[in-house]
Curated annotation (Swiss-Prot):
This is Serine acetyltransferase. Part of the cysteine synthase complex formed at a ratio of 1 copy of this protein and 2 copies of O-acetylserine sulfhydrylase (cysK). The complex reversibly dissociates in the presence of O-acetyl-L-serine in the absence of hydrogen sulfide. It comes from Salmonella typhimurium (strain LT2 / SGSC1412 / ATCC 700720). The gene is cysE. One of its GO terms (biological process) is cysteine biosynthetic process from serine. Sensitive to feedback inhibition by L-cysteine. GO terms for cellular component: cytosol.
């Protein structure tokens, strides 16, 4: 996301916060502490993450110091967060404000905390990265390994129960609903987790297991168990999953259409993909 777009997102957030504070005086101090007193999105993010992830072992002031260190070293993380905010605002019909993900949505919070953990992991500070992973799991019920590779423009919708394994890859503009697992198939080490390409939508409760690719613009139906690669621009569903059609757009993650080309299928156990 270009810098000017990042600034536009932040200006929208500040304007919304001022209107919200005027509309609901009981929350005015909350909006001031979380949004209005901050000069930029990075400052607001560091404050929010620090307070969400604080514990007796590592208080908020210490976590905020780590977050601010990461943002100073890699400002692209803030731009990625703005892309994630824009993704949620665009794709989730229940979200009508840019400020909502930053204030309230744990999928967004978990994703931004992952980005800090990923930076720490790549810097060799793996003990702290794993500590933050645990705090995210305890606080948000989302378990993302800090070594996983995740792009921008990501929506983790509802987010409870999402698991992303160590060698998983999630490219840009992907939407993932609650209780999705991107997991391995056993105790084998090495590259063992799914690769989710750009524009994919993964429905609630889907399990994608093993070092397999879900191709660009594919759609995975809710509750599916995917054990084989999914070709680009196809829809896979069932237990085990099989190809049932094609999405209605190049990037199903953007339109979030849960239907299969308007056809209502009755699923049976099949031969898989």
């Amino acid at each position: 996301m270009p810098c000017e777009e990042l600034e536009i997102v932040w200006k929208n957030i500040k304007a919304e916060a001022r209107a919200l504070a005027d509309c609901e005086p009981m929350l005015a101090s909350f909006y001031h502490a979380t949004l209005l007193k901050h000069e930029n999105l990075g400052s607001a993010l560091s404050y929010m993450l620090a307070n969400k992830l604080a514990s007796p072992i590592m208080p908020a002031i210490a976590i905020r110091e780590v977050v601010e260190e990461a943002y100073a070293a890699d400002p692209e993380m803030i731009a990625s967060a703005a892309c994630d905010i824009q993704a949620v605002r665009t794709r989730d019909p229940a979200v009508d404000k840019y400020s909502t993900p930053l204030l309230y949505l744990k999928g967004f919070h978990a994703l931004q905390a992952y980005r800090i953990g990923h930076w720490l992991w790549n810097k060799g500070r793996r003990a702290l990265a794993i500590f933050l992973q645990n705090q995210v799991s305890v606080s948000f019920q989302v378990d993302i390994h800090p070594a996983a590779k995740i792009g921008r423009g990501i929506m983790l919708d509802h987010a409870t129960g999402i698991v992303v394994g160590e060698t998983a890859v999630i490219e840009d503009d992907v939407s993932i609903l609650q209780s999705v697992t991107l997991g391995g198939t056993g105790k084998t080490s090495g590259d063992r987790h799914p690769k989710i390409r750009e524009g994919v939508m993964i429905g609630a409760g889907a399990k994608i297991l093993g070092n397999i690719e879900v191709g660009r613009g594919a759609k995975i139906g809710a509750g599916s168990v995917v054990l084989q690669p999914v070709p680009p621009h196809t829809t896979a569903a069932g237990v085990p999953a099989r190809i049932v059609g094609k999405p209605g757009s190049d990037k199903p993650s953007m339109d979030m259409d849960q239907h299969f080309n308007g056809i209502h299928h009755t699923f049976e156990y099949g031969d898989g993909i």
